[in-house]
Amino acid sequence: MILDAYDPQCPIRNILARLGDKWSLLVIYTLSQTERMRFGDLRRAVPDISQKMLTVTLRTLEEDGLVTRTVYPEIPPRVEYSLTARAFSLLPHIQALVAWAKENMESIIRDRKKTAGSKH
């Protein structure tokens, strides 16, 4: 198994790329706020994600064993999403990233403005 993050075939690189996409961490964090959520509730909680992207993100998280999709045999059908133990083991790391972002956001925003102002 390749464990060199610079190698495009490295599984660690692939996992980090999937988690580092635009929506995965936000969806995981949102699902962590409650025991389970229906698709529509999740979509309302993350209003700027499209229906298609939420579907793709949930499928990817399910493939990676981070989200469980439960279909209830009812009419109309009811589907709920919840985090797995693997996702819960990731939460402290997500929370640490959020804390780091809060701690550094003002200086990062300041630096972005400086950089944007210096571009020609």
How would you describe each model-predicted region?
Residues 2, 6-53, 80:
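N-terminal helix-turn-helix DNA-binding core of bacterial DNA-binding proteins
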Residues 14, 43-45, 69, 105-115:
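Non-catalytic interaction surface on structured domains
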Residues 14, 44, 56, 92, ...:
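Generic recognition of well-ordered alpha-helical segments
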Residues 17, 26-29, 68, 92, ...:
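A cross-family signal for key residues in well-ordered alpha-helices
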Residues 24, 36, 66, 99-102, ...:
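Generic structural signal for secondary-structure transition and capping sites
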Residues 54, 58-61:
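Basic amphipathic alpha-helical segments that dock to polyanions
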Residues 62-82:
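Beta-hairpin "wing" of winged helix-turn-helix
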Residues 85-120:
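Amphipathic alpha-helical dimerization/coiled-coil segments
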